[in-house]
C-alpha cells in the first residue's frame, strides 16, 4: 500500500524541497535589490575588480577574460538597442521609435532591461572568477593579440551602434524625470 495517501508523483524529495527553499530565499534577496541600482552596480564593480586582480596576479586565464569581454560587449549592445529595431521593417509587435518629425513620441524600450543587464554581467564575472580555479581553462595564448582584437571589435561595434542611434534619433540613457525650470512665484498662492 502507498503510505503517502496521495499521488506519489507530486511528493518532492527532501533534497528537492531544500533546493526549492534555497532558490526562493535567493530570489527574495534578488528582488529586494531591484530598487537599489547604485548599490547593485557598486557591488558588480567590486566583483569585477576582484576578478581582474585574480587574473593579474596569477598571470593566466586570458582566454577566459577574452570570452568574458565578448560576452559583456554583447550585453552592452543589447542594453543600448531598442526592443523594436526600426531597420527591421514594418513588422512590429510593440512600440517603435519615431523616424520622422511627424511621428508621435514613443518611449525608448530597451532590448535588454537594466536589471537583466546587471544580473547577467554580475553572473558572468562570478562564473569567470570560478573558472580561474580550474587549470583546464588556462589555455596558453599571447594576450596582447586578444586585447588588440577585442579593442578593434569594440570600436567597430560601438561605431555601428552610435551610427544607428544617430540615424534613428534615440538616446538610450535617461537620468530620471525631466525637470522644467518654470518661473518662480514671488508671492504665496491663495487657496
From Swiss-Prot:
A GO-annotated cellular component: Golgi apparatus
Alphabetized InterPro entries for the sequence: Rer1
Key words of the record: Acetylation, Membrane, Transmembrane, Transmembrane helix
Modified residues (N-acetylmethionine): 1
Domain of life: Eukaryota
Cellular localization per UniProt: Membrane
Disulfide topology: none
Keyword Transmembrane assigned: yes
A single GO BP: retrograde vesicle-mediated transport, Golgi to endoplasmic reticulum
Membrane protein topology class: Multi-pass membrane protein
Spans through the membrane: 39-57, 60-80, 115-135, 136-156
Pfam families: Rer1
Biological role stated in the UniProt entry: Involved in the retrieval of endoplasmic reticulum membrane proteins from the early Golgi compartment.
Entry's family note: Belongs to the RER1 family.
Protein name, entry field: Protein RER1A
Amino acid at each position: 500500500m502507498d503510505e503517502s495517501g496521495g499521488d506519489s508523483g507530486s511528493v518532492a524529495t527532501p533534497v528537492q524541497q531544500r533546493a526549492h527553499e534555497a532558490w526562493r530565499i535567493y530570489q527574495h534577496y534578488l528582488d529586494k535589490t531591484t530598487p537599489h541600482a547604485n548599490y547593485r552596480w557598486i557591488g558588480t564593480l567590486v566583483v569585477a575588480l576582484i576578478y581582474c586582480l585574480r587574473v593579474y596576479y596569477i598571470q593566466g586565464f586570458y582566454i577566459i577574460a577574452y570570452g568574458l569581454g565578448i560576452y559583456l560587449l554583447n550585453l552592452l549592445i543589447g542594453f543600448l538597442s531598442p526592443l523594436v529595431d526600426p531597420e527591421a521593417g514594418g513588422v512590429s509587435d510593440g512600440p517603435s521609435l519615431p523616424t520622422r518629425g511627424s511621428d508621435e513620441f514613443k518611449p525608448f524600450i530597451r532590448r535588454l532591461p537594466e536589471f537583466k543587464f546587471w544580473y547577467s554581467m554580475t553572473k558572468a564575472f562570478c562564473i569567470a572568477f570560478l573558472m580561474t580555479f580550474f587549470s583546464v581553462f588556462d589555455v596558453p595564448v599571447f594576450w596582447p593579440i586578444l586585447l588588440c582584437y577585442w579593442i578593434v571589435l569594440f570600436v567597430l561595434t560601438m561605431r555601428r551602434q552610435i551610427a544607428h542611434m544617430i540615424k534613428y534619433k534615440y538616446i538610450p540613457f535617461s537620468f530620471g524625470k525631466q525637470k522644467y525650470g518654470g518661473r518662480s512665484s514671488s508671492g504665496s498662492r491663495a487657496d
